[in-house]
Amino acid sequence: LEELDAMLRSFCEQIPKDTAVVITADHGMIETSKPRQLILDDCYEKSGSVQFVGGDTRVNYVYLDDSGAIDQVVADLEPFSYAFDAVKTEEAIAANWFGEVLQPAKDRLPELMLLAKSDFTLYHSKYFKARSFDMIAHHGSLSPAEIRVPLIRIGF
């Protein structure tokens, strides 16, 4: 981000005075802190049914070897449920979270999504990059800060 900031500053210093620059993104971010990082490795491994954990630190996509084990996986995660909402993907599809979902897309979706609450971040240390533990801002859940799309205007 520091490099991007420096490049943008340099670019804006060189544009004509009657020119505007508009910058946007596809999502917002939320600031987090190390004490609010939850490493869920033991919970994910307990059932033996978790094949892979993907997504982001604010929304974990949990893929299972056996979709019949979903309730057990949710139960294994219960000690940390204060920090996330566990949403079965079939329920999210039924609630139209994704719009129309065709079978090729369904085949790629996880069985379970964990949506972080407040400023918690959720990790499985095997699947998340080490550098993500040092980041101070994250995205992926449904907080107002994360679903708001930023827009910056420079000039005019």
Predicted regions and their residues:
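Feature captures the catalytic ectodomains and active-site-proximal regions of enzymes
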Residues: L1-F156
